[in-house]
Amino acid sequence: MGMVSEFQQFAIRGNVIDLAVGVVIGAAFGKIVTALVEKIIMPPIGWAIGNVDFSRLAWVLKPAGVDATGKDIPAVAIGYGDFINTVVQFVIIAFAIFLLVKLINRVTNRKPDAPKGPSEEVLLLREIRDSLKNDTLKSG
């Protein structure tokens, strides 16, 4: 079997296609969560604690300046505000995945309904058994 045909069989399998669909949907969901966090969740939180824009929060290690030749030197800073936004995004995505997995587990682990009574085969086998018992008792 050639390499191309092996790859085609691999790529056409349902699991690979499902994975690809999951990656695309996950990327789109990530963008939605990013917009939710940056545009809807964090602004009211920032407003509540004093008009703080979390995306701009940083610890400046070295302020921006100009060197002797007049060239701008950018500031050196640790942008912890973006980190806070990313953590909030992660928590939202993790919670959504948790709920999805919980739902999938509930659906797949559903116990089948208990049978309402013995099947026709079982009833027939019982009749045969009882008939054989009666025949052996009569002949014995």
Swiss-Prot record:
Domain of life, source organism: Bacteria
InterPro entries listed in its UniProt record: Mechanosensitive_channel_CS, MS_channel, MSC/AndL, MscL_channel
PROSITE patterns the UniProt entry points to: MSCL
One Pfam family of this chain: MscL
Record key words, sorted: Cell inner membrane, Cell membrane, Ion channel, Ion transport, Membrane, Transmembrane, Transmembrane helix, Transport
Protein encoded by which gene: mscL
Record's subunit section: Homopentamer.
Compartments where located: Cell inner membrane
Organism: Xanthomonas oryzae pv. oryzae (strain MAFF 311018)
Record-annotated membrane-spanning stretches: 16-36, 84-104
Role this protein plays: Channel that opens in response to stretch forces in the membrane lipid bilayer. May participate in the regulation of osmotic pressure changes within the cell.
GO function terms (MF aspect): mechanosensitive monoatomic ion channel activity
Coiled coil: none
A GO term from the CC aspect: plasma membrane
Major localization class: membrane
Protein name: Large-conductance mechanosensitive channel
Family the UniProt entry places it in: Belongs to the MscL family.
Recorded topology in the membrane: Multi-pass membrane protein
